[in-house]
Regions:
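A structural signal for small-residue-enriched, beta-sheet-centric alpha/beta enzyme cores
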Residues: 2-93, 97, 108-333
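Active-site-adjacent structural elements in enzyme catalytic domains
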Residues: 101-106
Length: 333
């Protein structure tokens, strides 16, 4: 499934927004987080692990109607358990098994909360629904989760496109998979002084994708020769039960060395979600499980005081960048 607008991948914040100060940096240069991927290309599914090098404060907002998640209550502001790793995967709710492998890998490396009896890692996870693109019976499991986590101890691999959790991602599914297009996982990062900010997006939406007001991927006509319109299709089905299943979901994670409380991080995640609304039409539907995390990485002594509003505004722009990257980096199918 080939995007009709085959522009090059987004090259950084300067390509898509006019914000003075921030400069684009590689996601791999972010301090405090390491990325590992494992995928089954034949089954078109996979796992991406974001391992924090120090336990981090985190928060999450769920904006879609059908999330598949693990341990999100443990990072609620009123609980504030330090996070050790975030997992994105395919497989829908079946894919949650991958976190068991991540937790076991972290335990093997002595990472987690020491209860005095055992080390217990805090691992959050969210999944996309990719069962309709590849194999519905082969899903991410504990073995894949362990391997993806293990990779973070020897390398740092934030590749874009059809890798890890983005292997089976698609967009524009208002008329089903036959008129959908391929997407994947995308990244964008920026630095202002000593403040670093990066966004990862696994793009697997019901809706169409826009960049700078132009549609770049989404629902196609039945003969796949041009774009159709998911928004109009949704309106035309207003009296029908269009959303018969929650077979989509876009995931995002904001990583920053900014010194924010869990409550502030939740607000940061909400501000970052504006990037979804700008790029995905329609967004946050009952057919999606859209979920956004915000995580403060690195040791507390190294965190940077920063304006929540400024970081939130920039995170929304970087979310737009990461969404475009997820489209332009996707393989042609």
């Amino acid at each position: 499934m080939k995007p009709i607008h085959t522009e090059p991948a987004a090259t950084g914040i300067s390509a898509h927004c006019q914000v003075p100060g921030p400069r684009s940096i590689p996601f791999s240069s972010l301090a405090g987080v390491r990325v590992g991927n494992v995928q089954d290309d034949a089954a078109a599914t996979g796992v991406t692990v974001y391992r924090l090098t120090s336990p981090g404060r985190a928060a999450v907002v769920v904006l879609g109607g059908g999330p598949a998640s693990r341990e999100t209550e443990s990072i609620a502001p009123e609980r504030n358990h330090p996070l050790n790793a975030l997992v994105f995967s395919g497989g829908s709710a079946y894919g949650l098994a991958a976190s068991g492998g991540v937790a076991r890998c972290l335990e093997d490396h002595g990472v987690g909360y020491d209860t005095g009896i055992a080390v217990v890692p805090i691992v959050c996870q969210s999944c996309i629904y990719d069962l309709g693109f590849g194999s519905a019976s082969l899903r991410p499991d504990e073995r894949m989760g362990y391997a993806a986590c293990k990779a973070t101890f020897s390398s740092n691999d934030p590749r874009s496109g059809n890798v890890g959790a983005g292997t089976g991602a698609t967009v524009g599914k208002a008329a089903g998979m036959r008129q959908a297009q391929k997407a994947g996982i995308g990244y964008a990062a920026a630095q202002m002084g000593s403040l670093q900010l990066g966004v990862a997006v696994v793009l697997n939406s019901f809706g169409d994708i826009y960049a700078d007001g132009k549609k770049i991927a989404g629902m196609l006509t039945p003969d796949r020769s041009d774009f159709a319109d998911s928004y109009l299709s949704t309106l035309q089905s207003a009296e029908e039960n269009l959303f018969t299943s929650t077979t989509n979901t876009t995931l995002a994670a904001v990583f920053t060395n900014g010194d924010f409380t869990p409550a502030q991080l939740k607000h940061l995640a909400q501000m970052a979600s504006a990037g979804f609304a700008r790029c995905i039409v329609p967004a946050f539907t009952t057919a999606d499980g859209d979920t956004v995390y915000a995580i403060s990485v690195g040791p507390d002594k190294d965190k940077v005081a920063a304006s929540l509003d400024a970081v939130g505004a920039l995170s929304a722009k970087l979310t737009e960048e990461a969404i475009a990257d997820a489209v332009y980096s996707a393989q042609v199918h």
